[in-house]
């Protein structure tokens, strides 16, 4: 069996062991690769990043007209990324003096596909000007292609910053998020500093799909190549705290000698934290992914060791600014990624609080 990816054969609570690490970013442009290939896009992305950092400049009255915006998000999870994101989006729209009506539907990740489909079809029937959605599964992709091919609704894909190569001539209005590959590489570098070569570790994926591929497989590739770490097991979960708890227990039962567990999401990480505590395995290092409120609290308590923290509100602000540019007739970048900061349990409460204020500058007010 290939030691680069030793996969657990246990399957519990609906979790399927990962069959193999698929080629990272197969079928997608990597974020920096896309910007390097299309210099005009890099110029637009840099300009949008500057607008995100700047104070809002209200739209000229003659450019205003009522907008209908639909949002379908997987918001029902411990991670507060999605809820904060839409909050920052609305507050920036208000400060830009944009006239809008918004319809929100929050669903659970890896569930409620029927509810998502109904909500998405409703958004199209209502002739929304903009539809904000995500792209994680094959079913999402089929719906997105339907929107791109047959409607005038402008599609903003959230939580993805890697343009789909096949859509070269019909890309969505914008991809926006925090580059999963970059965040995973930053964590890989930090783990490489913490542990010697040939360290044993396990991976707890998100549910099967894009996020697991990018966050999980990017990390695996990086630490195996740079640090010669040895992967012992990898589990797909249901993207919930409970499935993270169960996967961590199963993994440690079969491979008790791991030095750390790499978790691909907040909910999965916090479930693993609970399992480690119950098993008395505080010697096993565990990361978070995203640095939302729940993760920062866990780091301050010493329950999580490390996370890569998104400057959360950047993406909500970026969507609002992009819509303003569109109303003004300006070109909008195809892709935008917000900033990350690595946070560890050795960081001072003062540094963590400063990062919290920066990341949540709209959604906390």
UniProtKB/Swiss-Prot annotation:
GO terms for cellular component: periplasmic space. Keywords: Periplasm, Signal. CDD domains: PBP1_LuxPQ_Quorum_Sensing. Its main location: periplasm. It is found in: Periplasm. Binds to the signaling molecule autoinducer 2 (AI-2), a furanosyl borate diester, (3a-methyl-5,6-dihydrofuro-[2,3d][1,3,2]dioxaborole-2,2,6,6a-tetraol). This complex then interacts with the LuxQ sensor protein. This is Autoinducer 2-binding periplasmic protein LuxP. The gene is luxP.
